[in-house]
C-alpha cells in the first residue's frame, strides 16, 4: 500500500473514475493518505463525486509518472469519524481554506478490496492487493 501512496503523491495528480448512472465520469484528484493502515481519498459531500460514490462505490484511479502508470480499483467505504477527516486535512493543510473536519461537508473514503496494477511498456505488470 505504501508503494501505491508514494506513486500517487509523486505523480501529483491522479484521475478518479466513478459512474453516474450508465455514464462514466473522470476527474483529477490529488489527495491520498494512509490512516490506520488504510488508503484514503477525500472529497466534499456537496460534489457530484460524493453522490456517485454513494450510488456505486466501485471506483478506479489512474496515475502516470515516468513511463509507468498505476491503475487502482476497489470499493470506497466512507469513514465518518472526525479523526479520519482530521488526519486527511492535517496531511493536506492547503485544503483547510476550503474544508474542516467539522464542517459537515468534508468526506473521506478508504479503499476496500483494492487491486493496484503498475504497468509500463518495458516491464511485466506488478499487482498489489490490499
Please give the residue ranges for each predicted region.
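Acidic-histidine catalytic/liganding microenvironments
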Residues: 11, 56, 92
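A short, Trp-centered hydrophobic/proline-enriched beta-strand micro-motif
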Residues: 6-20, 59-61
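Charged, amphipathic alpha-helical segments
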Residues: 1-2, 43, 47, 93-94
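A short mixed-secondary-structure module that forms the rim of ligand-binding clefts
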Residues: 32-67
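Charged, gly/pro-rich active-site loop segments
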Residues: 71-130
